[in-house]
Amino acid sequence: MELIEKHASFGGWQNVYRHYSQSLKCEMNVGVYLPPKAENEKLPVLYWLSGLTCNEQNFITKSGMQRYAAEHNIIVVAPDTSPRGSHVADADRYDLGQGAGFYLNATQAPWNEHYKMYDYIRNELPNLVMHHFPATARKSISGHSMGGLGALVLALRNPDEYASVSAFSPIVSPSQVPWGQQAFAAYLGENKDAWLDYDPVSLISQGQRVAEIMVDQGLSDDFYAEQLRTPNLEKICQEMNIKTLIRYHEGYDHSYYFVSSFIGEHIAYHANKLNMR
C-alpha cells in the first residue's frame, strides 16, 4: 500500500493509502486512522462505509471521528464507495456507477467487471489491513446512508465476522425504494430474488440475525420517508426479536452535521463490543 497522505490527529495519524484491488481491478484509495496506541500494540478495527457521491475523504475530514477513535483505541478504516478510473463503467447520474457502488457484487454487464464492493469490503480489504497495520482480527462495521445499507448487509450475512454494527440514516429496504430499485436493476438485473441478498429488512425476515443493531436517524432528513424507511427495520427487528438501539432525532438532516453530532457515541458503542470476548 502506497502512503499518499499523512496528517497528525489527536496523537495518532490520519493517513490515506492507495493500492491496487484484485477484486475491483483498479487503484483504490482508503483512509486509515491509527490512534496513538497503534505504535505499540495491535488494536481492533472499525470499518466505515460512506454514502452516495462520497469517497474516502468525506468521513475522515467531516466526522471528527479521530478524537473518539484515539480515546477508545480503535483503528478506523474508511474505503471509497466504488471502483474508480476511466476504464471503470460509470453513469451520468449520482446514484449509479462511480461513487455509488452499493457494496454489492454486480452480476450484469458492464458493471460486473469491476463492481465487486461486497467482496472488497468483506475479504480483500480486511486482509490488507491485517497485513499492513497493527490490527487484531476483531472488527466492527458502520456507515451512512448507502454505507449504512452496506454495513447492515455485511453484518447480517456474516454475523460471526463483526463484533457489532451501526448505521446513520441507512437505506433499510432498498428493494422497495427508488435508490435501491434503480441500482439493483442495473447491477443485479431484473430477477428481484437476487435483490433480496442486499436488502436488510428482507435478510432479517429470512432469518438472518445479529445480536444488536444501532441506528441513528434524523427526522428532518429529506430522504427519510421515500428512500430510507427506518421504521421498516424497527418493525422487522421487533417481529424477529432482534435487539435494537434505534434513535430518532428532531431537527437533524442527512448531512455530516448529523453524523458528526453522534459519531462519538457510535465509536464508544463499537469499542464496548470490540473489547468483549
UniProtKB/Swiss-Prot annotation:
Keywords: Hydrolase, Serine esterase
Enzyme category, top tier: hydrolase
A Gene Ontology term for the protein's cellular component: cytosol
Catalysed reactions, as listed in the record: S-formylglutathione + H2O = formate + glutathione + H(+)
Catalytic residues in the record: S145 (charge relay system), D221 (charge relay system), H254 (charge relay system)
GO BP terms, alphabetized: formaldehyde catabolic process
EC number: 3.1.2.12
Any one GO molecular-function label of the UniProt entry: carboxylic ester hydrolase activity
Disulfide bonds, paired cysteine numbers: none
Reported function: Serine hydrolase involved in the detoxification of formaldehyde. Hydrolyzes S-formylglutathione to glutathione and formate.
Family according to the record: Belongs to the esterase D family.
NCBIfam families: fghA_ester_D (TIGR02821)
Protein name (Swiss-Prot/TrEMBL): S-formylglutathione hydrolase FrmB
Species in which this protein is naturally found: Escherichia coli O6:K15:H31 (strain 536 / UPEC)
